Amino acid sequence: AIMKHLMTSADSVFVIDELGYLESSCIPFQENIKSLLDNSRVLAVIRKQSTEFLDSIKSRADVLLIDIDNIFSSISCIIMASGMSKRFGTNKLLASFNNNTLFENAINISHFVSFGKTLAVTRHDELVQICEREHIHCIKHNMPYRNDMVRLGVSRILKETNRHKSCCTQGILFLTKTSLQLLCLLFIYYNSSYFACNSTDKSSNANNNYFNNNNINNNNKICRLAFNENAGAPVIFPECYYNELLTLPQGKGGGFIAKKHPAQVVLVPAQDEYELYDIDTPDDLIRLSRYLR
């Protein structure tokens, strides 16, 4: 099957359901796998066993290795929940949606990914109580500006973790599991040593073919969810932007940094336009609820 693929369809992806201990004893098979990796794109499941054969695959410079048991632990999630909801009339994060509050919905969405740490930043006592009930770490504050809230969240992440990458998640009220996981997976891909060694093109858009080395040659990528190239939230920043996150201009959030470094931004396609919606008024929430029925 491998030789037929290389002769007839080497440009397509060859899928291997498992490479493990048994394959380590067959030299001809190992040679075919090496030829396959040298000449075609491959998607393979590989066991965590340590053998000379498996280790040689995992150590290749052109292999992106993802540990599915620990895939997103290097990313921390910061839920920004300090808005005053002036146009809504009451705290919109306490409004009912799908038998939960909007804030509880955001917490549930954050569970779609096994983040290394999840943290909420809020000024509202009611949201602190929800965090305590849901076992979510929380910072209660009375700071006036968005940049203050970003600084509080990032500072806590840096203090309590080993330099985790930061995910500012304001605007995740309606994300699907697929979109959030894709955003995090592409962040890991674009900020991996594999991508840094193999990227050539300077495109900043991931919508067309986001696994085809189409960004500039470094691993300082900001990944941002978008729909039809219209950027939204959440946004994930690698650690090289921590100082900028800690020193944002008054009233600015993470989007300010993304706009400052457009060549470093990868737009990750959301599954549906509604995932990027924000709720400013009760009518907005009613319209969205009807749309999702």
Regions inferred by a protein language model and the residue ranges of each:
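Short, polar loop motifs at secondary-structure junctions
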Residues: 47-51, 122-127
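Conserved donor nucleotide-binding strand/loop of the catalytic core
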Residues: 132-146
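Conserved alpha/beta core of the MobA/IspD/sugar-nucleotide pyrophosphorylase nucleotidyltransferase superfamily
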Residues: 243, 247-293
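ATP-dependent small-molecule kinase phosphotransfer cores
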Residues: 1-11
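Conserved beta-loop-beta/alpha segment of the NTase-like Rossmann-fold superfamily
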Residues: 143-246
